[in-house]
Regions:
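Auxiliary, metal-adjacent structural segments of Zn-dependent hydrolase domains
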Residues: 1-37, 58, 75-89
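Short, charged/polar micro-motifs that form catalytic or ligand-binding hotspots
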Residues: 30-38, 118-125
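Catalytic Zn2+-binding segment of zinc metalloproteases
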Residues: 37, 43-63
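Conserved phosphate-interacting/catalytic interface
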Residues: 63, 67-79
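Secondary-shell segments that build the walls of catalytic and ion/ligand-binding clefts
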Residues: 74-102, 107-108
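Pan-zinc metallopeptidase signature
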Residues: 97-168
Length: 168
């Protein structure tokens, strides 16, 4: 189910869309059609993630790749910012890390800093958002670059999509 409109959680969290209780909530205030498509695909990725947790995270490979990327990013950030102490070990969503990246660093600056490490600034937020950005890249991005930059994530997505296709 997809609901389009203005929802309190969007204003509270300053977001355009979210996935909750098997439904996607998306704002009707979009820059253009592609912006809405990107938001929908991103939230579909969270639905796929929720229903395939063991496959995605069971072997720990994706978490290790994510943390390795955070460890590459941390010294770059620490040149100008006070990086949270658990930044290099915490792969789960953490409000203080999210606030640090969004409010202190800012996504414009972070997009410049994370080039070649993460596919986008938002992918640095948590392993779940890393997964979601990878999902977007498979459908809307440069697959070859993504495959080189995020090999574990790319392989997980390719295997899961193949399995889902075979079972439908």
């Amino acid at each position: 189910m997809i609901y389009v409109g203005q929802f309190p959680e969007m204003k509270e969290r300053d977001i355009n869309a979210y996935y909750e209780n098997d439904a996607i909530y998306i704002t009707n205030k979009q820059d253009d059609e592609m912006d809405m498509i990107e938001d929908i695909i991103h939230e579909i990725s969270h639905a796929v993630e929720q229903h395939n947790q063991e496959f995605i995270y069971g072997d720990g490979g994706l978490q290790r790749e994510f943390i390795a990327k955070r460890r590459r990013l941390s010294p770059l950030l620490s040149q100008k910012y006070d990086v949270p102490s658990d930044f290099n070990i915490n792969f789960e969503y953490d409000r203080s890390i999210d606030d640090f990246l969004f409010r202190d660093v800012g996504y414009d600056a972070l997009n410049q800093i994370c080039v070649g490490i993460f596919p986008s600034a938002y992918a640095c937020t948590s392993v779940s958002e890393y997964w979601a950005k990878g999902f977007e890249e498979v459908f809307l991005g440069d697959k070859d670059n993504f495959k080189q930059q995020c090999p574990v994530l790319y392989k997980k997505l390719a295997l899961l999509l193949k399995e889902l296709k075979e079972n439908t």
